Amino acid sequence: MAPINLNLILAFSLALLGVLIYRTHLMSTLLCLEGMMLSLFILMTLLISHFHMYSMSMAPLILLVFSACEAGVGLALLVKISTSHGNDYVQNLNLLQC
């Protein structure tokens, strides 16, 4: 396995570990999710160019579009939650009431 692929897999794993550990604030969870999506985007782009699968060249762009949509929805939820509850603590939220 190439060192760049190993570094990207390690970056994804660290971002996933960040989601699992730092889940007290919604903002830190959203930042870790963005790190995961960015490492997936770069890894997918490198693998497509390495294996010459140019028919799949739109897949990283679609992933990037979904990542931007996820960030927008996440920030909208963050604003809504922080205005209604006064903080962004995840453990104090019941998402069925929001």
From Swiss-Prot:
GO terms for cellular component: mitochondrial inner membrane; respiratory chain complex I. InterPro entries: NADH_UbQ_OxRdtase_chain4L/K (IPR001133), NUOK/Mnh_C1-like (IPR039428). Keywords: Electron transport, Membrane, Mitochondrion, Mitochondrion inner membrane, NAD, Respiratory chain, Translocase, Transmembrane, Transmembrane helix, Transport, Ubiquinone. Its EC number is 7.1.1.2. It catalyses: a ubiquinone + NADH + 5 H(+)(in) = a ubiquinol + NAD(+) + 4 H(+)(out). It is found in: Mitochondrion inner membrane. It is an enzyme of class 7 (translocase). GO terms for biological process: ATP synthesis coupled electron transport. It is a multi-pass membrane protein. Pfam families: Oxidored_q2. GO terms for molecular function: NADH dehydrogenase (ubiquinone) activity. The chain crosses the membrane at residues 1-21, 28-48, 59-79. Its main location: mitochondrion. Core subunit of the mitochondrial membrane respiratory chain NADH dehydrogenase (Complex I) which catalyzes electron transfer from NADH through the respiratory chain, using ubiquinone as an electron acceptor. Part of the enzyme membrane arm which is embedded in the lipid bilayer and involved in proton translocation. Belongs to the complex I subunit 4L family. Core subunit of respiratory chain NADH dehydrogenase (Complex I) which is composed of 45 different subunits. This is NADH-ubiquinone oxidoreductase chain 4L. It comes from Isoodon macrourus. The gene is MT-ND4L.
